[in-house]
Every structure is written in C-alpha cells, then in structure tokens.
C-alpha cells in the first residue's frame, strides 16, 4: 500500500487500481504541491464539511466518477450536486471492494450542511488506517483500539482547531497503532507544531513508530 501526504488533512492511499483520498483540500491548499486535476481516486472519504477538508471533493468526484463516502448529511448534500455518494454514520461499518470502512467519532464541527464530524478506520487491502479527521482528544479512542488493530493512525497535531501534539501523543497511547503520522499543522501560522519533537515524544512515550512526511512525500507500507 502506498500512502501519500498531499498536505493539511489530505492523504491518499493506493493499492493496484484502488485509490482512496481523504479530505481533498488541494487547489487552495498553500502547502500542496499538486492540483486537484492530478488525482483520480475511486473513493473520496470526507470527515466533515469545512472548506479546508471538503476542498475540491465534489469536483474531483464528478471528474472521476468517484464514490464519496461520508456522513448521511454530507452524502445527501453531495448527491444534490450530482455526486455519487454512500451515506454512513458514526458507529457504522460497510464492506466495499477494497475492504471495510468504520466511521468513528470526532470532536469537531462540520459546517452548516455537514451534521457531525467523524473519523474513519479503513481496512484497505489488509492495512488498517485510522484517519481521525479534525478532533480533540477523547477517551473513547481506547474503544477504537479494542475494535481495530490499527496499522497507522493519522492524527492532527496543530492545536487551536484540533488537539495539539501533546494530546496526539496521548491519543497514540490510547489507540496503540503500529505507526502514527501527524497532519493538520503548519498549513498556516495559526496551527504551528514541531513535528520532530512530536516524533521524539512518540518514540519515548509510546510503542509506535512515527512517520513525518512533507507535503508531496509518500511511503510504502508492506
């Protein structure tokens, strides 16, 4: 499985002909190295409807005939705009061609059309990826670790709108993933974080690896 960090909260997973993109905020993303026309996902997963996460999702979905997977409110809003969508909600699971999606809670807003914000645990060709979305720390992350053995947790660390790096270390302790990757930081001055210090803290305080990717970087997970 290839994991690519596009920037902010946007991450893409690829395996064979399957591509999943989370929160494709690309064209107006000041740290992204590509444009929305450079991605061609089969599936788009939206954690919430704020502009810095919804981003270019609707246009990408129309251009590529992608299936948008999100909460019922977001899926309904997308369908009204001509996008193919599958509605889910917190606590729900669903099998797809690539594997399984579980919708998890997130402590955040979503935008007027968005309902509740969420996260996802995606079993993508046998690798379990937890994208927390925008969220504060919450103790029920421990339940997520009881339900799923996570290979990599993608966690926000920028503070202000989400948990910061210190809380993300605690989240890692709750989730017990094999690896963790920080996102949603240093996009703007309002959400600063020291990713090298975060990596050091993860190494010292958890049993997880930490992968710090710059926007445009990718890695293989075997």
From Swiss-Prot:
Q: Under the GO molecular function aspect, what terms does this record hold? A: hydrolase activity
| Top-level taxon in the UniProt lineage | Bacteria
Q: Which UniProt keywords apply?
A: Hydrolase
A Pfam match: Lactamase_B_2
Gene3D superfamilies cross-referenced by the UniProt entry: Ribonuclease Z/Hydroxyacylglutathione hydrolase-like
- What family is this protein classified in? Belongs to the UPF0173 family.
Q: What is this protein called?
A: UPF0173 metal-dependent hydrolase Nther_2337
